[in-house]
């Protein structure tokens, strides 16, 4: 009969590794979050999907899910969530946030243009000279005529045609830079 060598484990010699216990509920929450990330990927257009760094298996699964309906779609999204659990989802999430924020950034730029237009019509020359300092290649005469006609339209309670034209001109001027 062979003798077994007994291994004596000395707990004091080992480095203390901190064990992090994760609850089952937290694991489920993480899985659900990844499943929702998968749903967002499925709802993207082809051009936006190309901007996201996906491996080929995940990309194929997402493209298949875009063609499925109802229960098959639900199962495919579950599968996409499973694939996302196996990889690091941070780069995917960052790329998705960048795509989603692009629309909000565009809206913020348009809102700033509206405020600038209002300032041009209300303040007149002071705001006009500030704009010309920032954008010296602007058509000074055309913009000045638009501002004057917008002020007249406001005084006479006419439809704000020039007001809209100022916005379009500013949009063309500023967003092209």
UniProtKB/Swiss-Prot annotation:
Keyword Iron-sulfur (UniProt): no
GO-annotated molecular function: ribosome binding; rRNA binding
GO cellular component terms attached to this protein's record: cytosol
Coiled coil regions, renumbered to chain: none
UniProt xrefs under InterPro entries: DarP (IPR006839), DarP_sf (IPR023153)
Gene Ontology biological-process entries: assembly of large subunit precursor of preribosome
Subcellular location: Cytoplasm
Keywords: Cytoplasm, Ribosome biogenesis, RNA-binding, rRNA-binding
Family to which this protein belongs: Belongs to the DarP family.
Function: Member of a network of 50S ribosomal subunit biogenesis factors which assembles along the 30S-50S interface, preventing incorrect 23S rRNA structures from forming. Promotes peptidyl transferase center (PTC) maturation.
PANTHER family noted in UniProt: UPF0307 PROTEIN YJGA
Protein name as catalogued: Dual-action ribosomal maturation protein DarP
Gene: darP
């Amino acid at each position: 009969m062979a003798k077994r060598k007994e291994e004596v484990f000395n707990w004091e010699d080992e480095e203390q590794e901190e064990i992090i216990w994760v609850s089952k509920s937290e694991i489920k929450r993480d899985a659900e979050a990844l499943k929702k990330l998968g749903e967002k990927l499925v709802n993207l257009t082809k051009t936006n999907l190309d901007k996201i760094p996906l491996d080929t298996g995940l990309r194929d699964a997402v493209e298949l899910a875009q063609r499925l309906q109802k229960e098959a779609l639900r199962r495919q999204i579950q599968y996409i969530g499973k694939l996302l659990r196996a990889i690091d989802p941070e780069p995917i999430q960052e790329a998705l946030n960048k795509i989603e924020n692009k629309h909000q950034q565009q809206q913020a730029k348009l809102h700033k243009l509206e405020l600038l237009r209002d300032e041009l019509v209300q303040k007149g020359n002071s705001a006009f000279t500030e704009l010309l300092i920032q954008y010296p290649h602007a058509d000074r005469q055309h913009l000045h005529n638009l501002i004057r006609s917008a002020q007249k339209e406001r005084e006479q309670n006419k439809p704000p045609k020039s007001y809209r034209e100022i916005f379009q001109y500013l949009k063309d001027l500023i967003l092209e830079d």
